[in-house]
Amino acid sequence: MTQGGRKVGMPEMVLEYVLKQKGLDVGRDDPTHEVNVRTDVQFDVMAGVFASGQGDYVALFEPTASQVVSMNKGYIVSSLGQESGEIPYTCYSSLKSYMNENKDVLTKFTNAIKKGLEYVNTHTANEIANIIKPHFETNTIQEIETVVNNYKSIDAWPNTILLKEEGLNKLMDIMELAGELDKRAPYDKIVTKEYA
């Protein structure tokens, strides 16, 4: 049994996608399948539920995954991000009217994102860990550095903020496979390259 998180959340849909790409028979909350992905465990308690002995696998974000390892309650066996290939896991959207009326705000916002990506792609794990430490109060610098090294080892951070068409198509493939997308959106209708 595998804990996937909230039904149709990105972690759960990506987990299902990766398992199915590996040829496994996957069911949601259905133990009759080769892999039963539970969606009844709230995301914020998944690590604790797993550590208590429920489930064989769990999909966790960092630094939670590394904390489970440091508590000797599990191992990191794979990265869903690496296994799935490049997908636009985090995207920013706005109404067209907002875009038309606030180009300066969007330019500043996207420039800040670009600057952050440039930083993580050109600095050491230790430098990054020291910068982001205030946002991870319960983690040590060593834990954060381990997480950053894990991300760097799989090229988790892109080199551009541009949402590529291939990435959007893969995201829609994942959503279709999960039964959560009725109609695909045309790339040129929902993505702007103006700020990339």
Please place each PLM-identified region on the residue numbering.
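Bilobed "Venus flytrap"/periplasmic-binding protein-like clamshell domains
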Residues: 1-70, 85, 165-169
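Short, solvent-exposed coil/turn linker segments
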Residues: 25, 31, 78-80, 124, ...
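A generic structural-conservation signal
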Residues: 28, 59, 77, 142, ...
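Pocket-lining segment of extracytoplasmic ligand-binding domains
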Residues: 42-136
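Residue-level signal for threonine
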Residues: 95, 164, 192-194
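Secondary-structure end/capping motifs
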Residues: 100-183
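Hinge/cleft segment of the Venus flytrap/periplasmic-binding protein
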Residues: 183-196
